């Protein structure tokens, strides 16, 4: 079993990289977000999840830059109907924190993407809603937010994830009006 790989990126493809580790090239599948951060010649260290594809009689390697992202994949593939490829697509769109929020809030819109039907989205929410605490979101990145401020921004027409990412930067004990005002300033600049 491979736990992690550290090496130089030789090739970047649409869904994977060739990672050169001591002159051995490993094909490692990555989420779109992680793939965008890789460039030829850059040095990367990836946590590795190995999937034995019995139909093709090969082992596929999936790489992650964070333990949280790897844990999300492990939870997602336990859901009936979610393949490794589907899980990587989800992680390409949502951070572990956003996935956690979408499952907790039963936000089907946030989980909507190509190849993911409503039945599968409902199954993901149903099967993982009790397990999301296992995501162990890093306490520095995930903290309670002011739900009233989030609701106000959504009602003003901002996308839920964008609003969430903006207001999570502010301490939840600030006055709701102040959080909304600061968030609106930031969102109007973007």
From Swiss-Prot:
One of its GO terms (biological process) is DNA repair. Residues 66-143 are annotated as: Domain II. It is found in: Cytoplasm. Gene3D superfamilies: 5' to 3' exonuclease, C-terminal subdomain (1.10.150.20), DNA helicase RuvA subunit, C-terminal domain (1.10.8.10), Nucleic acid-binding proteins (2.40.50.140). Residues 147-190 are annotated as: Domain III. One of its GO terms (cellular component) is Holliday junction resolvase complex. Residues 144-147 are annotated as: Flexible linker. The RuvA-RuvB-RuvC complex processes Holliday junction (HJ) DNA during genetic recombination and DNA repair, while the RuvA-RuvB complex plays an important role in the rescue of blocked DNA replication forks via replication fork reversal (RFR). RuvA specifically binds to HJ cruciform DNA, conferring on it an open structure. The RuvB hexamer acts as an ATP-dependent pump, pulling dsDNA into and through the RuvAB complex. HJ branch migration allows RuvC to scan DNA until it finds its consensus sequence, where it cleaves and resolves the cruciform DNA. It comes from the Bacteria. Residues 1-65 are annotated as: Domain I. The gene is ruvA. Homotetramer. Forms an RuvA(8)-RuvB(12)-Holliday junction (HJ) complex. HJ DNA is sandwiched between 2 RuvA tetramers; dsDNA enters through RuvA and exits via RuvB. An RuvB hexamer assembles on each DNA strand where it exits the tetramer. Each RuvB hexamer is contacted by two RuvA subunits (via domain III) on 2 adjacent RuvB subunits; this complex drives branch migration. In the full resolvosome a probable DNA-RuvA(4)-RuvB(12)-RuvC(2) complex forms which resolves the HJ. It holds the Pfam family RuvA_C. This is Holliday junction branch migration complex subunit RuvA. GO terms for molecular function: ATP binding; four-way junction DNA binding; four-way junction helicase activity. Has three domains with a flexible linker between the domains II and III and assumes an 'L' shape. Domain III is highly mobile and contacts RuvB. The keyword Repeat does not apply. Keywords: Cytoplasm, DNA damage, DNA recombination, DNA repair, DNA-binding. Belongs to the RuvA family.
């Amino acid at each position: 079993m491979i736990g992690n790989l550290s090496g130089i990126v030789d090739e970047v493809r649409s869904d994977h990289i060739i990672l050169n580790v001591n002159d051995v090239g490993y094909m490692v599948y990555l989420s779109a977000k992680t793939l965008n951060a890789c460039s030829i010649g850059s040095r990367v260290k990836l946590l590795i999840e190995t999937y034995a594809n019995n139909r093709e009689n090969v082992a596929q390697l999936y790489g992650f830059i964070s333990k949280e992202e790897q844990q999300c994949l492990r939870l997602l593939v336990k859901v009936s109907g979610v393949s490794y490829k589907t899980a990587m697509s989800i992680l390409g769109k949502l951070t572990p924190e956003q996935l956690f929020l979408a499952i907790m809030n039963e936000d089907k819109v946030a989980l909507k993407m190509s190849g993911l039907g409503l039945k599968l989205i409902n199954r993901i929410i149903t099967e993982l809603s009790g397990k999301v605490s296992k995501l162990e979101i890093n306490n520095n990145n995930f903290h309670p937010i002011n739900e009233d401020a989030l609701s106000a921004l959504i009602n003003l027409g901002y996308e839920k994830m964008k609003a969430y990412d903006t207001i999570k930067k502010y301490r939840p004990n600030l006055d709701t009006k102040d959080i909304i005002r600061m968030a609106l300033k930031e969102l109007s600049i973007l």
